[in-house]
Amino acid sequence: MVSRRVQALLEQLRAQGIQDEQVLNALAAVPREKFVDEAFEQKAWDNIALPIGQGQTISQPYMVARMTELLELTPQSRVLEIGTGSGYQTAILAHLVQHVCSVERIKGLQWQARRRLKNLDLHNVSTRHGDGWQGWQARAPFDAIIVTAAPPEIPTALMTQLDEGGILVLPVGEEHQYLKRVRRRGGEFIIDTVEAVRFVPLVKGELA
């Protein structure tokens, strides 16, 4: 039984065009308040982005749902997330597929996310401290790659780590950003522009 606040958010997401009920069920199952600081717990189920420290944010539920829906996941999908952040998007993915790989460049955020996921008994996630621009070559290829920060252009390494038929969803741009979906098909990459967005930048390198 979902709470009134959760139900209200789900209805809002449906009104915004989210149609995949499995994605909506995953959002309902993951307690977003566990991924934000106590000061923001009362706003956890509002459809807004919230700060998580280190200059990073937890994306608004609409954007989490939209990007996840665009990945066209099945339980068997091999998924890579670039930018673990709070671990919220990771948890949504973990409810939808058998295993998630996630890369985070800020070690403090990586450890916090791992603790949150463990506390929620989500053990089907592998996290790595590293440069998201480089993906996770040792675990490639992937059926789906999601990037939760915006590079100025699509990283080549991520495109090459897509399997045939795989989908990459990411925001791209600097001052003006657009959500892009890249599909690998027959050795080519088909790129679609979805909508205008605003994300923190995807920074190269890693932080201790």
UniProtKB/Swiss-Prot annotation:
Signal peptide: none annotated. One of its GO terms (molecular function) is protein-L-isoaspartate (D-aspartate) O-methyltransferase activity. The lineage of its organism: Bacteria, Pseudomonadati, Pseudomonadota, Gammaproteobacteria, Enterobacterales. It is found in: Cytoplasm. Catalyzes the methyl esterification of L-isoaspartyl residues in peptides and proteins that result from spontaneous decomposition of normal L-aspartyl and L-asparaginyl residues. It plays a role in the repair and/or degradation of damaged proteins. This is Protein-L-isoaspartate O-methyltransferase. The active site is at S59. The keyword tRNA processing does not apply. GO terms for cellular component: cytoplasm.
